[in-house]
């Protein structure tokens, strides 16, 4: 016992020293600015900090590639599918078409005897359509429904403690005695909905799968996640490959689709290699039920800065699994399609909310770095502090008073994006990933300021993405973007003022013209390819019935 405690202390000290040393090393490399390659007049340079970031991308991609190879090799052996599984669907003001497609995909799941529990966040007349769709698709004679005036933590109007206890027991009994059931309950947020399903199921099943009501599951999705959990008893949770259902509806949803592929099949695949996936996404995840009930109350009652948390439910659920020392994995063999915002403002609000949960959960995550591979500490430091270094770099370049610095920055952003997307195209075997380089512009212009705004308002939970039946537009997300653009515009004006006071040399003019032409040609080429792709694939997908998950 004392030996284990001593080893734990050593691991805590070791991971802390590693993390601090890594951060100090990166900061020193950034401040010193040592250059390996440097041309006359500083038209091009490549330094220590740039070399470190390039090495990170290469190493991350290598481990992702190795994890994909491991998925193909280790999971070919069939296993017995004799464990019980329950699928929990969280629904809130869902678009009727998406909900119907979700439930139709649930009926096609190939895992034997899977139990389906859908909990609707809201019990008003406006929410009844979701229950009607559930009964229609799942079969009125094969499913049960119940309108609950309460939820497990709040009483409805006119309820007493005794009647609330009785109704809670009734809901639990309904869930346990029916293979398919839909419950409408008093509004309380997604975490409340998930808690109802977890609490009512109790320990009656071996594995619990989570799913959102806008998600279409591949028939084999449950089977493939069970395989991962069955293969290693120390894996506590597993997530699958989330793809975009409405990718051709707008430029935002299209860029999100390529970003999703990169996030899951490069970043999370790399994390999976070391058993430390930091977020099992809500649309497609599975957990060991025995673990779930070790922390479900702590998960529900999570507080941050004195307030109960109302977002970041899936990330904190993953964090709780990691806190127990269990591994979290990703499998590309389990797939689903899910909806993503098609309007810029709704996307921005979604990203800000996700960024809030990321930075909040980063702090929780740091408490159990010592329980996992050093890669978990390494990646948390890199991804957590990268936005700050990037903002410092952008402001520095824009306010140096040299127009070439601004142009070089724009070219570098696209070049790095193009290199990364080219590798992804090879790994995926699909040229569409080349558009990932366009996402870098969206990241620099919108996501970067959204991350800073998320930190500044991390304890504010009053807004985010809305239900899909009624889209609510929130303009608050434009505040950080407007401030960011004002800062950049100030740098451009300052640069123009400084450059106007000194004549351009012939070599400088040549470099600027060549750089501008390269940048313009890049955009013309990518935008042309985008128009061609949308015209070709968008029409083909329009009105198509999704019988299975497609990777297009």
UniProtKB/Swiss-Prot annotation:
Cytoplasmic side: 1-11, 67-374, 424-429, 497-510
Recorded topology in the membrane: Multi-pass membrane protein
Membrane-side (Extracellular) residue stretches: 33-45, 396-402, 451-475, 532-552
Activity regulation details: Regulated by several post-translational modifications such as ubiquitination/deubiquitination, phosphorylation and O-GlcNAcylation. The enzymatic activity depends on the availability of UDP-GlcUA and UDP-GlcNAc.
Keyword NAD appears in the UniProt entry: no
Cross-referenced Gene3D superfamilies: Spore Coat Polysaccharide Biosynthesis Protein SpsA, Chain A (3.90.550.10)
Processing and modification events after translation: Phosphorylation at Thr-328 is essential for hyaluronan synthase activity. Phosphorylation at Thr-110 is required for transport from ER to Golgi. O-GlcNAcylation at Ser-221 increases the stability of HAS2 and plasma membrane localization.
Domain of life, per lineage: Eukaryota
UniProt keyword list: Cell membrane, Chromosomal rearrangement, Endoplasmic reticulum, Glycoprotein, Glycosyltransferase, Golgi apparatus, Isopeptide bond, Lysosome, Membrane, Phosphoprotein, Transferase, Transmembrane, Transmembrane helix, Ubl conjugation
Associated pathway: Glycan biosynthesis; hyaluronan biosynthesis
Catalytic activity: [hyaluronan](n) + UDP-N-acetyl-alpha-D-glucosamine = N-acetyl-beta-D-glucosaminyl-(1->4)-[hyaluronan](n) + UDP + H(+); N-acetyl-beta-D-glucosaminyl-(1->4)-[hyaluronan](n) + UDP-alpha-D-glucuronate = [hyaluronan](n+1) + UDP + H(+)
Recorded disease: A chromosomal aberration involving HAS2 may be a cause of lipoblastomas, which are benign tumors resulting from transformation of adipocytes, usually diagnosed in children. 8q12.1 to 8q24.1 intrachromosomal rearrangement with PLAG1.
Assembly and interaction partners: Homodimer; dimerization promotes enzymatic activity. Forms heterodimer with HAS3. Forms heterodimer with HAS1.
Protein family membership: Belongs to the NodC/HAS family.
Protein name per Swiss-Prot or TrEMBL: Hyaluronan synthase 2
Naturally occurring in which organism (per UniProt): Homo sapiens (Human)
Gene from which this protein is expressed: HAS2
